[in-house]
Structure formats: structure tokens, C-alpha cells
Amino acid sequence: MESTVAHAFHRFALAILGLALPVALVAYGGNGDSRKAAPLAPKAAALGRSMPETPTGDVLTISSPAFADGAPIPEQYTCKGANIAPPLTWSAPFGGALVVDDPDAPREPYVHWIVIGIAPGAGSTADGETPGGGISLPNSSGQPAYTGPCPPAGTGTHHYRFTLYHLPAVPPLAGLAGTQAARVIAQAATMQARLIGTYEG
């Protein structure tokens, strides 16, 4: 009789211990730490909207197969040649705008080309082409097109900046041309990449 009672008591004690142990583990985090565990961050789907992934290669780049950065621009892309835009290669994950100017011009930077609305992604152009999706604005000559380097004789080496800008939104540019439009674009931009070519007057 005593052994039966003892056996029943033993089973009862084990049952109580089995219930108490999970409670203790919850109270102390399962590892002796009484601090509460940080809640898990909700997934994007739980927020009722999908989160876009960060684009790969999200850095602006611009280059040209016709000349290296800091090297002379071939004559065919100047006023002494065919006066056409050089071929360009770029990466603009969010789209952008292109400004080509000459900061060494006598009075103020001379803007040779402005292109807005360049399509997002990587792209390239052949000789004389405008970047995909782009619209040319009037340059310092008042022409909505590319005009090549044509520095005055005897003014030395001029540096031509091919600057690719990221614009979160296209700023108001109606009625603007040349340096005015270029300044507005530069002020509205959040990122830029630059290629420089030279030409001697």
C-alpha cells in the first residue's frame, strides 16, 4: 500500500514539475536572462504594401568609348569636325539629366548640351545620338541640340564636363536655357557622375 501511494505521489510531483518548467523558461527567457526579448520586426507584406528592392549598381556612372576621362576630345565631335555628340555609356538606375558645359569659357560656363528625362537603367549612344528617353533643352547658343567644343583661338586648353545628374523630379525649366537651366538642374540633383574631355583653342 505504501509503495502504491509513494508511486502515485512521485507521478504527481513529476506532473507539477513538467508544468512549472515551461513557465520558468518563459519568465526567464529560457537562458537565465530576465529581460524581455525584442519583438520581431514585421515583414513588409504585413504592412499592407510591398517594399521595392534596392536596385543593383545604384551608382551613377558615365564614360565614352571615344575618349578617356581627362583626355582630348576627338576633332570629329568639335566645331572643326562633324560637330556631333560623342558616343556615351552610362548607368542611371533612377534616370537623370545630362549637362555638357565648358567652365573655361571667357565670361561664364558655356553650356553645349542639356538633356533631361533620360530613362532609368544602363544605356549607351552611338555618334550623334541623344540618350534614350531624353529631350534636349536650348543650350547657350539657343539650340535644343549638341554643339561641339569651339574655344576661341589662343585661349589654351578647355575642359568639357559631361555631367550626369540624378533628379528625383524634373524641376521647372520652362523658358530656361543654357547656364540658367544647368544651374536649376544642378541644384535639384541628389547625385552626379562626371566625365571630362579636353580641347585646345
From Swiss-Prot:
Q: Where is this region: Disordered?
A: 125-146
CDD domains reported in the protein's UniProt record: PEBP_bact_arch
What InterPro entries is this protein classified in? PEBP, PEBP-like_sf, YbhB_YbcL/LppC-like
- Cite a single Pfam family from the UniProt record: PBP
Q: Which domain of life is it from?
A: Bacteria
Under the heading SUPFAM superfamilies, the entry gives: PEBP-like
Please tell me one Gene Ontology term that the record gives under cellular component.
extracellular region
Task: Give the family per the record.
Answer: Belongs to the UPF0098 family.
| Protein name as annotated | UPF0098 protein Rv1910c
Q: Which organism is it from?
A: Mycobacterium tuberculosis (strain ATCC 25618 / H37Rv)
Lineage at the top is:
Bacteria, Bacillati, Actinomycetota, Actinomycetes, Mycobacteriales
